[in-house]
Amino acid sequence: MKVRASVKKRCEHCKLIKRKGRVMVVCSKNPRHNQRQG
């Protein structure tokens, strides 16, 4: 899980979601794409 100022979808499998008020990118195909806005 990378923490970034700006999160973007990196492939077509990435999903933008909101958990506990934080914007996150979760990817089912490639877990390296997981990001959290910090």
Curated annotation (Swiss-Prot):
Gene Ontology terms for molecular function: structural constituent of ribosome
Tell me which PROSITE patterns the record gives.
RIBOSOMAL_L36
Superkingdom: Bacteria
Quote the SUPFAM superfamilies the UniProt record gives.
Answer: Ribosomal protein L36
Which BP terms does GO give this entry? translation
Any single GO CC term annotated in Swiss-Prot or TrEMBL for this entry: ribonucleoprotein complex
Q: Which InterPro entries match?
A: Ribosomal_bL36, Ribosomal_bL36_sp
Look up keyword Ribonucleoprotein and say if it applies. yes
A Pfam family reported for this protein in Swiss-Prot or TrEMBL: Ribosomal_L36
Membership in a protein family = Belongs to the bacterial ribosomal protein bL36 family.
Please state what the protein is called.
Answer: Large ribosomal subunit protein bL36
Q: Which organism does this record belong to?
A: Kosmotoga olearia (strain ATCC BAA-1733 / DSM 21960 / TBF 19.5.1)
What does the record give as the organism's lineage? Bacteria, Thermotogati, Thermotogota, Thermotogae, Kosmotogales
What gene does this protein come from?
Answer: rpmJ
